[in-house]
């Protein structure tokens, strides 16, 4: 039994909880540094030659489950342990403290008043009905009172005692919600061209809808660097009774029927070329070997002898570079400019069609997360409320009035109120 009590004491200690929080925070930070959810080959290829922190190669990353930290056994165990620590602290400290606060404490001796933080004593001429008058006076001032024959116990701000317990409950809900979300959340990356649509199905709420990309645009800085990606999306419910156009931007996601749509990326998916008076819409693919965010396609050009040419583009405004695969010399082609003659073929660029990269995420844990933050914020705010206690004792034999007070916060503020109340009560 002693071992169990000692274990509960250690688990419920503040030092243990803080140590766990620091460990979870560091682990979460590592999770943002190491790519999560990739296949084993990715970690072996990327981290064997350049180990993380100088010693974590691909094999160690996989053994330590650093490739999926948030669903790893040791991370979940840390979350569970922190939940147990917070619950143990609540039952061992917060709840007994709250119960003790609910009990009315009686001070019947003038000697006990002298030991309080604040105390004052007065000689009075009339003691009759003083207790009743003081009781009514305090109630009008917002104090909760318990009246005895010759003394009064009063308190105000008891809700502040509930604050730490509410914060603990909020943290527990947050941890449970985070663990739940790690296993149940789903995400899908989808590229849409203007005019294309996608059916959305939220399995957790059993709701269906259709999303259509109305327009996609890119805002750029003066030096050409992308500043913002903007997708205008048309949402239509399954029964077509609901229709709304919303705009998604980077760091400004859309929430719709339990789903969250993030603006994540972009691409140049298609170009429209006119080759020898015939229009062609060509689908491009990303070519990382050439550079970051470069898209292209290999085509044959020539009215007589056909040759391979590589078409590449890295900007939604152009130009399109046409390169000879033999020596990679080429020319730039701009939208609606005069056609270029390439190997006896006349080529002109009519349209560049960018696509919007969206991440559609379904996370059933979001309501838990929001609710937990509401609890944490509410608990933090009310725990700032000071709990003040007041005692009044009337000694009929000595015709004396003793008043004492305690406050767990803001003693300076309570001191002003205490002496103001004392002056008014003694003059009854």
Curated annotation (Swiss-Prot):
Segments crossing the lipid bilayer: 14-34, 72-92, 162-182
Primary localization class, coarse: membrane
Function of the protein: Required during biogenesis of c-type cytochromes (cytochrome c6 and cytochrome f) at the step of heme attachment.
Keywords: Cytochrome c-type biogenesis, Membrane, Thylakoid, Transmembrane, Transmembrane helix
Annotated HAMAP family: CytC_Ccs1
Protein name, as recorded: Cytochrome c biogenesis protein CcsB
GO biological process: cytochrome complex assembly
Family: Belongs to the Ccs1/CcsB family.
Highest taxon, organism lineage: Bacteria
GO CC, any one term: plasma membrane-derived thylakoid membrane
Membrane topology according to the record: Multi-pass membrane protein
Compartments where found: Cellular thylakoid membrane
Organism of origin: Prochlorococcus marinus (strain MIT 9301)
Pfam families found in the cross-reference section: ResB
Subunit structure: May interact with CcsA.
